[in-house]
């Protein structure tokens, strides 16, 4: 089984983009070249601020969904290490 990772990228306007991949370095390089998500194209210098192993693809997708539901403050707490990523992986899914 291939290991998937969840990552957060900070844009120059301080927004946080959340994504999943099997290779964080490759995917971040794609984003920097403008070959990744449309949401990041033309946004200027990007900074990878968080990445963590998320298990299988389905587990990574669930964690990505949960993180995208967080407030900006909660995402900043995750980046700062004040909110445990493991809690995002194991939290019950919202209907």
Swiss-Prot record:
Pfam families: GIY-YIG (PF01541)
UniProt record similarity statement: Belongs to the UPF0213 family.
Organism: Cronobacter sakazakii (strain ATCC BAA-894)
InterPro entries documented for this protein: GIY-YIG_endonuc, GIY-YIG_endonuc_sf, UPF0213_domain, UPF0213_GIY-YIG_endonuc
CDD domains the record matches: GIY-YIG_UPF0213
Stretches of the chain forming a coiled coil according to its record: none
Domain GIY-YIG residue range list: 2-77
Name this protein carries in UniProt: UPF0213 protein ESA_03545
């Amino acid at each position: 089984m291939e290991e998937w990772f969840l990552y957060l990228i900070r844009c120059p306007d301080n927004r946080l983009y959340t994504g999943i991949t099997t290779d964080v370095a490759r995917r971040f390089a794609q984003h920097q070249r403008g070959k990744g998500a449309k949401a990041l194209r033309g946004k200027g210098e990007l900074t990878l601020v968080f990445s963590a192993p998320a298990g299988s693809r389905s587990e990574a997708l669930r964690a990505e969904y949960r993180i995208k539901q967080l407030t900006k403050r909660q995402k900043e707490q995750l980046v700062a290490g004040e909110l445990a990523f493991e809690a995002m992986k194991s939290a019950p899914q919202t209907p």
